[in-house]
């Protein structure tokens, strides 16, 4: 392939405007401080644990009794050690799943750990272990409650806010509140008071992210670990309503007709074409949620379905390495521990993540590029076997790069394209499976929304 480096963001910019009023509108959208923190700590572990763990089921019925919760103790310190070994920086615990059983001694229901043989408060034990181990702690609270009698009536919103208040005021710093949109087909048509929930969280835990059915983090659209070719953080604001309102939502006249059906499973969420048809835009990064096992809750029948360390590392590269965050579910067993198979796979995953950056060739903090920097050369001190290139944009100035390439300078002096991609965003990890001996790399920004701003680029062998 004959290189053509003259066509770049400083010249043709992919045939689209580098700067105009629309581009300025796009790049005015930037993350809040808690979203910047998320970009710096993009890998958490989900802990599905509760009544379903005791019964070895995926979904309960709401008809369980407190006697069905037969788990008497947990080892949260082991959970924390396992999560840290994997390279994750936080835990999100299912404090109440759809069955309505509460892992803390809630004052508002008897269907709680306080009326079981379990000794203590599970939420407190886990949150304390996270604090001691230097991990973030987040809470999952299911809006759908199959047990609570007030569900489906306005009184349920009071009940839900009371429980939310308990979780947000008794367990230290909460990094994230995770709202699930799932509910059964035969459930009464009941509208949750989302605005009230959000206001309560902003008041009691102002730094907490509100995820999935919330305004801060969006669902990637599947639970299989798949991401889009171009995963944008700047998207139409309407997308934040898609998960919680579904087809019942009313659309404003300011939204174009083609945007009315936009949802988190669409392939194109943030291209210029999509953004041009949206009146309001938000910073709304994608989260990849996937389980280490076949199911979300532990079951001994699924002990042989644990994903290998190699597969988990591949999921990391495809999520964190593709401008997303990763929420990997690791369900504790009915003995209150992470199963040895899960722990072994997670340890191997963490080793692979750390090994990726153990041997840097060079790293640079670039900042905003200059008008003459259509491409930038990075020269090595000698021939190195390049295995990874890791790039990050300065997201506090929005997401700008729309197309880029990496070209390696081979020992014979010839240039070889080693990667052609679109977005960079929070992080882009380019992996050369077999490695490539080279003297350096040329970064070519082909297309951008205004001047590219590259926070860092690193080359690793």
Regions found by a protein language model. Give the residues of each.
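Exposed beta-strand face motif in extracellular beta-rich ectodomains
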Residues: 437-441
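Mature catalytic domains of secreted/periplasmic carbohydrate-active enzymes
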Residues: 2-434, 444-460
């Amino acid at each position: 392939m004959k290189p053509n480096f003259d066509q770049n963001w400083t010249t043709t910019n992919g045939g689209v405007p580098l700067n105009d009023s629309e581009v300025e509108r796009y790049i005015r959208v930037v993350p809040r401080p808690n979203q910047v923190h998320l970009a710096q700590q993009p890998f958490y572990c989900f802990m599905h644990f509760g009544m379903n763990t005791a019964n070895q089921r995926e979904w309960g019925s709401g008809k369980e009794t407190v006697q069905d919760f037969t788990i008497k103790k947990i080892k949260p310190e082991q959970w924390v050690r396992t999560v840290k070994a994997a390279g994750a920086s936080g835990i999100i615990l299912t404090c109440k799943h759809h069955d309505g059983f509460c892992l803390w001694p809630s004052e508002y229901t008897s269907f709680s750990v306080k009326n079981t043989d379990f000794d203590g408060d599970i939420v407190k034990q886990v949150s304390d272990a996270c604090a001691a181990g230097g991990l973030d702690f987040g809470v999952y609270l299911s809006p759908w409650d199959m047990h609570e009698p007030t569900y489906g009536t306005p009184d349920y919103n009071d009940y839900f806010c009371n429980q939310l208040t308990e979780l947000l005021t008794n367990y230290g710093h909460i990094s994230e509140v995770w709202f699930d949109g799932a509910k059964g087909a035969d459930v009464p048509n009941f509208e949750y008071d989302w605005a009230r929930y959000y206001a309560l969280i902003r008041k009691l835990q102002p730094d907490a992210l509100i995820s999935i059915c919330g305004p801060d983090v969006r669902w990637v659209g599947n639970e299989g670990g798949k991401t889009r070719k171009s995963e944008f953080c700047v998207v139409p604001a309407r997308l934040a309503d898609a998960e919680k309102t579904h087809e019942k939502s009313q659309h404003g006249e300011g939204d174009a007709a083609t945007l009315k059906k936009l949802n988190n499973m669409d392939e194109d969420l943030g291209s210029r074409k999509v953004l041009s048809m949206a009146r309001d835009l938000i910073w709304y990064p994608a989260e990849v949620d996937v389980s280490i096992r076949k199911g979300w809750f532990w079951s001994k029948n699924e002990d042989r379905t644990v994903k290998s360390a190699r597969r988990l590392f591949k999921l990391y590269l495809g999520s964190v390495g593709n401008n997303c965050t990763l929420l990997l579910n690791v369900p504790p067993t009915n003995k209150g521990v992470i199963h040895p198979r899960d722990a072994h796979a997670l340890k191997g995953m963490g080793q692979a993540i750390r090994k990726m950056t153990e041997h840097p060739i060079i790293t640079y903090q670039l900042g905003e590029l200059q008008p003459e920097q259509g491409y930038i050369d990075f020269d090595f001190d000698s021939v190195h076997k390049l295995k990874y290139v890791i790039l990050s944009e300065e997201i506090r100035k929005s997401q700008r790069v729309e197309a880029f390439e990496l070209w390696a300078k081979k020992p014979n002096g010839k240039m070889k394209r080693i990667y052609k991609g679109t977005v960079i965003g929070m992080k882009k990890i380019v992996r050369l499976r077999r490695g490539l001996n080279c003297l350096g790399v040329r970064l070519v920004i082909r297309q951008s929304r205004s001047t590219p701003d590259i926070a860092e680029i690193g080359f690793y062998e």
